[in-house]
Amino acid sequence: MLTLKILVYTVVSFFVSLFIFGFLSNDPGRNPNSKDFE
């Protein structure tokens, strides 16, 4: 049960950080410099 809870928190934290990173990199994403990350 503890392992499942840790797994859930890990997945949730991953998606939250991924969403925040995508939201923050959305503004400079319109710049030509964004092509370097792809």
From Swiss-Prot:
One of its GO terms (cellular component) is photosystem II reaction center. Coiled coil: none annotated. It is a single-pass membrane protein. One of its GO terms (biological process) is photosynthesis. InterPro entries: PSII_PsbI (IPR003686), PSII_PsbI_sf (IPR037271). It is found in: Plastid, Chloroplast thylakoid membrane. Pfam families: PsbI. Keywords: Chloroplast, Membrane, Photosynthesis, Photosystem II, Plastid, Reaction center, Thylakoid, Transmembrane, Transmembrane helix. The keyword Lyase does not apply. The chain crosses the membrane at residues 4-24. PSII is composed of 1 copy each of membrane proteins PsbA, PsbB, PsbC, PsbD, PsbE, PsbF, PsbH, PsbI, PsbJ, PsbK, PsbL, PsbM, PsbT, PsbX, PsbY, PsbZ, Psb30/Ycf12, at least 3 peripheral proteins of the oxygen-evolving complex and a large number of cofactors. It forms dimeric complexes. HAMAP family: PSII_PsbI. Belongs to the PsbI family. One of the components of the core complex of photosystem II (PSII), required for its stability and/or assembly. PSII is a light-driven water:plastoquinone oxidoreductase that uses light energy to abstract electrons from H(2)O, generating O(2) and a proton gradient subsequently used for ATP formation. It consists of a core antenna complex that captures photons, and an electron transfer chain that converts photonic excitation into a charge separation. This is Photosystem II reaction center protein I. The gene is psbI.
